[in-house]
């Protein structure tokens, strides 16, 4: 199951667990990984040529 837009917190994980168990239907569950996008603090834009 892939879910985007949730904050990285225990509460978010606990919200996903019931959905994961329902989809598993008795099969084993593997937690593959976690991808986190961190906002850039000092995002610099490309300078104008003119």
From Swiss-Prot:
SUPFAM superfamilies: Lesion bypass DNA polymerase (Y-family), little finger domain (SSF100879). One of its GO terms (molecular function) is damaged DNA binding. GO terms for biological process: DNA repair. This is Uncharacterized protein HI_1564. It comes from the Bacteria.
